[in-house]
């Protein structure tokens, strides 16, 4: 299927203006969309990590229409934004890059894949001296220095408050990871610079039985081999008995590419990574241009 671009050239516009300016009015799919999977950061959320009121309302409208809306994030469960969680009717959350699926109604985990202890030991040996984040039972813990000075490790200024309000700092992360060696949903390695990231990425080839991805130039994210948003979405779709052709997925990062490839309709925001764009069927306006809201409205109209 050719990639269709669904964005207007101007970045200063309202949703109504975008509707008038959109060059593509074709029906996006001939299949009824029953499930919409949403990546959050830099996709559904704006670049300042906030949720636009227009986007929140459109998601709520989708839920009210009977469409299953699923969060699909690299974030740990306990760091998901309240602005999204408070939208009534969202039940399932794929978290930690697909390492777990949370049922927020029953407050249980449907599925969970933790890193194997021998993998964690190999990881600590391979990346000795690096700064880590570790997710345990949905709670993110991070290196104490990173918590105190996130900018020094490449954190965006817009995400400083996110780090401070969601992470629990630990000064001895390797020791912490060993104490919780059988409980780790996933581990992030702080890169700081693109050059250092390239060096660390090369080292990941020494690991086996892992899923390695990245949602940000400052992070390398490592989970169990069974993880991945695409694999998790496939498992959830099987539980809900929804075929891929009735699924739409939105994303922006490398860690979203497999999810977009699995969905019958893979949609990348215009600001997405090259790998994510390549996996998409459609490209919509950026996260700061209400791309998710605009496209969901089109999907609801098509439905």
Regions found by a protein language model. Name each.
Residues 34-47:
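Asp-based phosphoryl-transfer active-site loop
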Residues 1, 21-22, 26:
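Methionine residue identity
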Residues 130-131, 135-250, 254:
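Conserved acidic, metal-coordinating active-site core of Asp-based
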